[in-house]
Amino acid sequence: VNKNLYYLISLSGAYDSQSFWRTKDIEKMDTVLNKPALDCIYTDCTDILGSLYFCSDDARTELEKRLAHIPVNALHFIDSGDYHYVSLLFLQRINQPFSLLLFDHHSDCMESAFGGGLLTCGSWVLHALENLPNLKKAVLVGPADEDKTAEQLLKDSRITWVTEAEFEQQKEALCKELSKWPVYISLDKDVLNKEEAVTDWSQGTMQLSQILCFLTDAKKSGAIFLGMDVCGEQKVSPEGFHLDEENGANLNSSTNEKIKFYQKDLTFSL
């Protein structure tokens, strides 16, 4: 098994303008198959209707079918934050008690703005807490204070809420918390500063190095990581590719490259 293997799930086509996943080293050959060795498996889901911001029942069924070949215990790049609900499709396959560690500038615990309990990019954590008995803890790092409006969330003992400002002083306590159950990591790049990511949503000011160092510390403290996903790409405008979008794509690609490189320090196990 290739431990560096990671998975790209294209929903908006944003990865087409990024270079981090393309094979640069022509010399790197698979000696058995005699062709370039790829570290990446690309799954195209751009044709699935009813998947932007919210996930219709039909879209969910189709996504579950297309993602069935992708193991939970791997690194997944899942496109723009508009599709962050894809995390739930991996979480629902975890068949043991676990914690969710979410780095995000938004809580993703909001009731669906579309009503009717619809699964959306802003409600998927709530869906997970309501429907997945194996999810014992959700550790949310980075949400803005105004996201705390949902009072019932603050009363839910399964949720640990840490703002950016609190993160450094809370790290030790979080490491202890994350050693209780195996952990699935979800990183929305909108938690990062604008020198490291360009997203479709309001952003925080965290640094990628802060997050990666914390994951290393958590692992040293006994955390077991099940898998990880990354979202927060900038969607390409329908009218075409502009210079600022090219700059954003290059920035996001560079950050994704660092995450991809870091994954060899993480061992995912189910």
Please report, for each region that a protein language model flagged, where it lies by residue.
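Hydrophobic alpha-helical segments and helix pairs
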Residues: 79-131, 136
